Regions:
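Aromatic (often tryptophan-rich) hydrophobic motifs at membrane interfaces
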Residues: 108, 126-137, 260-370
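Short strand-loop junctions, especially beta-strand C-caps/beta-turns
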Residues: 116-118, 147-150, 218, 295-297, ...
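The substrate-binding groove and active-site-proximal loops of carbohydrate-active enzymes
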Residues: 114-120, 302
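Non-catalytic accessory segments adjacent to catalytic cores
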Residues: 123-181
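A conserved beta-strand-loop-helix scaffold within acyl/acetyltransferase catalytic domains
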Residues: 27-105, 151-153, 166-175, 179, ...
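Active-site/acyl-donor-binding loops of N-acyltransferases
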Residues: 2-45, 99-105, 164-191, 325-405
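A structural signal for short, well-ordered beta-strand segments and their strand-loop junctions
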Residues: 143-148, 216-219, 265, 326-329
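Acidic-and-aromatic substrate-binding clefts and catalytic sites of carbohydrate-active enzymes
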Residues: 120-123, 151-156, 223, 335-342
Length: 405
C-alpha cells in the first residue's frame, strides 16, 4: 500500500527498527532513496545546530518555527527536526515537526508542520514529504499529520499539493491559518516604501509622533496579563477566534535573537504601569519575509488615535533592515467592513499599506491510522457536546446573590 502511494520516485524504506543513535542529540536515518537521505533530530544539540547553520549558509531560508532558537524558548514542546541531504550536495531542505499529545485519546500524538515550502530543490522538498508520511505511518499512535504549506509561488503549492494527495493527505476540513495575505514589497528604501501607502495610512503613522505616545520594544519580563488583555479586546471587536501565545517565550526569543523576533509596543508617556501599554505588534523574520502573527490594542476614551499604524511601520522598517524581501500581514479577507465582513475592518487596515494580495497557504491532513482517527474525532465531538450542555445548564441555573448589603 505504501509503496503504491510513493510511486512518483522509487524509494527504499528502512527495514526494521531504526538503529539507536550514539547520542540522544545525533540524528537518526529516517528515509533513504538513490538521491536523498532524510535525517530525524529528536533532541536539541550541537548536531542539529550545525545542520541548520549549513542550511542557512547554503541560502535556505528557515522559518523561525523550524529553528533551534524557537525550540529553546519553548522547552515544554516536543519539536523534532527533519533534514534532507542530497548525495554529494549537502543539506537541501529542513523543517520542524511539532509533536503534541492528543486530548481526545491519551497516549496518542499529533504531528504538525508549520510553513512548509522552503527548499533548495523540488526533489528535496518531495523527499521530505515522503519521509514525513513514512514517519506518521510507522508509529501506531500517531492520529494525524497536519501540514501547513506556505509558498508565494503557485507552482510550488500545486506540486506540493499533488504529492501530498498521492501520499494520502486530504485538504484540511478546518483551517488553522490563512490562505490569502497582503504583502508589502521591501525593495525600495524606507521613503519609497512609505510612499506606496495610502495617504490616510501615512497620515495615521505621523499622528502618533504628535501625541504623548512612544514606540519601543517590549522586553522581559513579559507583561503577560496586559498583552492577553489587549489581544482579547482586539479579537472581541473583530470576532476572531481565541488566540493563545506564550508571551514569555516571545520576549525570550526577541531578547535572545532580535534579528528573528520583534515585539514592539505603543506606550503612553503620560502614564505608568501596565496600563501605559495601549497596543502591541509582533513580527517574525523567516529569512526572505517577515510576518505579523499577532497584534492587539485598546481604545482610550475620547481618543480616535489609530494606534497600530505606527507599530506596523516599525515592524516594516525592522524587516527592511533585516534584509527581508516582503512583509506579510498574516492573512486577509476579501470583504470590507461596509459589507458586513466581521474581519473587514482589519482587512481594510491592511490594504491601506498595500494593494498586493496573493494566495500563499494551503493545509493538508493525513490520518495514518483511520480507525483510531475516527474514534478520536468521535470522542472529541462527544466531549464538546457535553461541555456545551454543561455550560447551558450552568447558565440556566439561578444565581443566589451573596454580595454584602
Amino acid at each position: 500500500m505504501i509503496e503504491r502511494l510513493l510511486r512518483v520516485i522509487p524509494v527504499r524504506l528502512s527495514k526494521g527498527p531504526v538503529a539507536p543513535a550514539a547520542s540522544p542529540s545525533r540524528p537518526r536515518l529516517l528515509w533513504q532513496d538513490p538521491e536523498y537521505e532524510v535525517e530525524l533530530f529528536e533532541q536539541l544539540g550541537p548536531e542539529r545546530a550545525d545542520c541548520e547553520a549549513r542550511m542557512l549558509a547554503a541560502g535556505l531560508p528557515l522559518p523561525v518555527q523550524h529553528r533551534t532558537e524557537w525550540a529553546i524558548v519553548h522547552p515544554t514542546r516536543r519539536l523534532w527536526f527533519v533534514a534532507v541531504k542530497a548525495a554529494g550536495a549537502g543539506y537541501q531542505a529542513g523543517f520542524a515537526v511539532d509533536v503534541s499529545r492528543s486530548r481526545a485519546m491519551p497516549g496518542h500524538v499529533l504531528f504538525s508542520v508549520e510553513k512548509f515550502g522552503a527548499a533548495l530543490s523540488d526533489g528535496a522538498r518531495a523527499a521530505g514529504l515522503r519521509a514525513l508520511a513514512h514517519l506518521g505511518r510507522s508509529r501506531a499512535r500517531v492520529l494525524r499529520v497536519h501540514v501547513d504549506v506556505y509558498a508565494q509561488d503557485r507552482a510550488i503549492r500545486e506540486r506540493v499539493g499533488t504529492l501530498l494527495q498521492e501520499l494520502g493527505f486530504r485538504s484540511a476540513a478546518q483551517s488553522r491559518t490563512y490562505r490569502d495575505t497582503v504583502l508589502v514589497d521591501l525593495a525600495p528604501d524606507e521613503d519609497g516604501i512609505l510612499a506606496t501607502f495610502r495617504r490616510s495610512t501615512r497620515r495615521n503613522i505621523r499622528q502618533i509622533a504628535e501625541q504623548p505616545f512612544e514606540v519601543r520594544t517590549i522586553a522581559r519580563p513579559a507583561p503577560v496579563g496586559r498583552l492577553e488583555a489587549l489581544l482579547g479586546e482586539s479579537l472581541a471587536r473583530t470576532g476572531g477566534p481565541p488566540h493563545h501565545e506564550d508571551w514569555n517565550g516571545v520576549t525570550a526569543l526577541s531578547d535572545r535573537c532580535p534579528e528573528l523576533s520583534r515585539l514592539t509596543g505603543l506606550f503612553r508617556t503620560d502614564a505608568q504601569g501596565p496600563e501605559a501599554l495601549v497596543a502591541f505588534a509582533w513580527g517574525l523574520n523567516h529569512g526572505d519575509y517577515v510576518d505579523n502573527p499577532a497584534t492587539g490594542m485598546t481604545r482610550l476614551p475620547r481618543s480616535r488615535t489609530p494606534f497600530t499604524y505606527a507599530l506596523i511601520w516599525d515592524l516594516i522598517r525592522w524587516a527592511k533592515r533585516a534584509g527581508a524581501r516582503w512583509f506579510d500581514f498574516g492573512g486577509v479577507t476579501m470583504g470590507h467592513l461596509r459589507e458586513g465582513d466581521p474581519l473587514g475592518g482589519i482587512s481594510d487596515f491592511k490594504r491601506g499599506f498595500s494593494n498586493t494580495i496573493v494566495a500563499v497557504g494551503e493545509e493538508w491532513t493525513l490520518e495514518p491510522n483511520p480507525l483510531r482517527g475516527q474514534l478520536a474525532a468521535a470522542l472529541s465531538s462527544a466531549s464538546s457536546y457535553v461541555s456545551r450542555r454543561l455550560r447551558a445548564v450552568a447558565q440556566a441555573m439561578p444565581i443566589r446573590n451573596t454580595s454584602p448589603v
